[in-house]
Every structure is written in structure tokens, then in C-alpha cells.
Regions:
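Conserved phosphate/pyrophosphate-binding and hydrolysis machinery centered on Walker-type P-loop NTPases
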Residues: 9-21, 33-47, 64-71, 148, ...
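Hydrophobic positions on the alpha1 helix immediately C-terminal to the Walker A/P-loop
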Residues: 100
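Phosphate-binding/switch region of NTP-binding enzymes
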Residues: 218-308
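Cytosolic-facing regulatory segments adjacent to core modules
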Residues: 76, 107-195, 209, 308
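Short, small/acidic-rich helices and loops at N termini and domain boundaries
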Residues: 1-60, 84, 90, 95, ...
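Conserved P-loop NTPase nucleotide-binding/switch module
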Residues: 132-141, 204-228, 250-254
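Pre-Walker A adenine-sensing motif
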Residues: 71-80
Length: 308
């Protein structure tokens, strides 16, 4: 506490937001040190709860052990989104990353009102996301919503979507350039007040590390490490969308590979699951796969890889 007070009296050219961020970070570190005392467990202590978890899974008939995404093939590969896991969904612009993540968020929140979802959107405003959800749930073309040229049938669908959305426990924070400390504080508050079953971050590279003099790769490493720690702390899955670098554009085969991730080293290391999204029609207008997206699971720490 003395250090925090001294920093406030002697800011050394730092902005108020940087001072608050550093104070929150120091408070978090103090809390972490306290929570880390005597945290070891004997293996024998873990046997019964682990056996109980296995028995619960067997009672489901080999079904999902995590939260259903609403995508049958993704659930088959992952057994659902698992608690404490950091999931990266990556792709080039216009591939449908946000739409894919929103579909998962909508499915989880609408399937059970006790499954609140938090969306931290640093790319789009809350209004833009709301329009996206109306389009998705109401099956109304985005261009019709943008121009306002709606048929009577469109209006019926919009009304139906809005009725569903009123019941959905989805919370949107559209603050740009969040820091890991800010995001963690906001996520904890929602968890404490409403509970959380999933966090979606759109997108990873738009997060910032204030006052950092490190290169961007090192900053991304700090961000992914913090997100993984938050997933474990809150015991929920976190989906972080990520942008792929331009090297994809120089290749004949545009299908994403792991090295296409910007500042990919730490992302690959910290993520429990990495999925790439690819739409062939973006590069080949005459493709027979119009309106289709390929989802490729390139890494899964505790399961198989594959695509659908």
C-alpha cells in the first residue's frame, strides 16, 4: 500500500489511467501472493474428485464434459468448451471470426439462462454487435439491417430475434484497447454479480500493455499469459479471437497454418485450443464452397485435432 501511495504522490509523468492500472496490478499481485500460500495437494487428495468427475462423464453416455458450442462437429472434437481453458479462434479479416464466436455465445446464453456470457469487443461497438445478433438470430440479411429496407417478413424476424435477445444473459463491454488488468477486473465483477460461463474477446491483438517498453511479441505473451490465468481463476472457458498476419496472402495455398499467427510463439504456447477459420470464397470467387467456412482445430492440449 505504501508503494501505491508513493506512486500517486510521485507519478513521474504517468497518466491517471496508467497509475490506476499499476495500482490494480499491485493489488492483484498482493492478493495472488496471499492465495498462493499452501496450495499444494497430495495426489491421494485428488483421486476421489477425479474419479467422481469421470463417473459423471460416464453417466452422460460419453457425451459432452464441457459447455456445448452449438456446433455438432466442434463439440465432437472437443467434448465441449472446458473450464479453465484458453481457446484461440484465428483468421484473416472477413473470415467470420466474430460471427462464429457470437454464434457460440448466443447458443450458450440462450440454451440456459444460468449461463451468462461476457463479450469484450475492442473492434466493434455494442450497437454493431447487437445488429449482428439480430441478423444471426432473426436470419435477416445484414445489408437489410444496415439500409433499413426491411420487408414485413423481415420485421417479424427482427421482432422474434429481439424477444430471444431480451432473455439472453449476455453482457457487452465495448471499451477499446483494454489492458489485461482492466479486463480481469471487469470480468471478476461480472462473475461476482451475475456469474459467468464464457468470456469472448474480440480481438486479442487490440489489447494493450500500458507503459510497456517491450516489443509487441513480448506484450502479446503477457496478454495471453494473463488470459490463461483468468480462465483458470474463474474456472470458465475464454475464447480470444486473433488476427493472422499477411504472410497468408503471399502463399498459393491460403489455408492458415500455426506460423501465420501474429506474435505466434506465446499464443501457441498458452492456448489450450487453437482453431483457424477459412472461407475459400474470399480468395476464389468461383469456388463451389460459397457461404461455407472451414474450421480447423490445429492444436488441442487434451484432445484430437481435425477440421469440419
Amino acid at each position: 500500500s505504501n508503494n501505491i501511495a508513493q506512486t500517486a504522490y510521485k507519478p513521474e509523468g504517468k497518466s491517471p489511467s496508467q497509475l490506476v492500472d499499476e495500482a490494480e496490478q499491485k493489488i492483484f499481485e498482493i492478493a495472488e501472493r496471499g492465495s498462493r500460500n499452501s496450495t499444494y495437494l497430495e495426489l491421494r487428495q485428488m483421486i476421489q474428485p477425479t474419479y467422481d468427475r469421470l463417473y459423471q462423464r460416464s453417466q452422460k453416455g460419453g457425451g459432452l464434459s464441457g459447455v456445448s458450442t452449438g456446433f455438432r462437429e466442434l463439440d465432437r472434437l472437443t467434448a465441449g468448451l472446458q473450464k479453465g481453458e484458453l481457446i484461440i479462434i484465428a483468421g484473416r479479416p472477413s473470415m467470420g471470426k466474430t460471427a462464429f464466436a457470437l454464434n457460440i455465445a448466443e447458443h450458450i446464453a440462450l440454451s440456459d439462462k444460468n449461463n451468462p456470457v461476457a463479450i469484450f469487443s475492442m473492434e466493434m461497438s455494442a450497437e454493431q454487435l447487437t445488429f449482428r445478433m439480430i441478423s444471426s438470430l432473426g436470419m435477416v440479411h445484414g445489408s437489410a439491417l444496415k439500409t433499413g429496407k426491411l420487408t414485413d417478413k423481415d420485421w417479424d424476424r427482427v421482432d422474434g430475434a429481439i424477444q430471444q435477445m431480451k432473455e439472453a444473459p449476455i453482457f457487452i463491454d465495448d471499451t477499446p484497447s483494454l489492458t489485461p488488468v482492466e479486463l480481469r477486473a471487469r470480468a471478476r465483477r461480472i462473475q461476482r454479480e451475475r456469474g459467468l460461463s464464457l468470456i469472448v474477446i474480440d480481438y486479442l491483438q487490440l489489447m494493450q500493455v500500458p507503459g510497456s517498453k517491450e516489443n509487441r511479441a513480448t506484450e502479446i505473451s503477457e496478454i495471453t499469459r494473463n488470459l490463461k490465468a483468468l480462465a483458470r481463476e474463474l474456472q470458465i472457458p475464454i475464447i480470444a479471437l486473433a488476427q493472422l498476419n499477411r504472410s497468408v496472402e503471399q502463399r498459393t495455398d491460403k489455408t492458415p497454418i500455426m506460423s501465420d499467427l501474429r506474435e505466434s510463439g506465446s499464443i501457441e504456447q498458452d492456448a489450450d485450443l487453437i482453431g483457424f477459420i477459412y472461407r475459400d470464397e474470399i480468395y476464389h470467387k468461383d469456388t463451389d464452397k460459397k457461404g461455407q467456412a472451414l474450421i480447423a482445430i490445429a492444436k488441442q492440449r487434451n484432445g484430437p485435432i481435425g477440421d469440419f
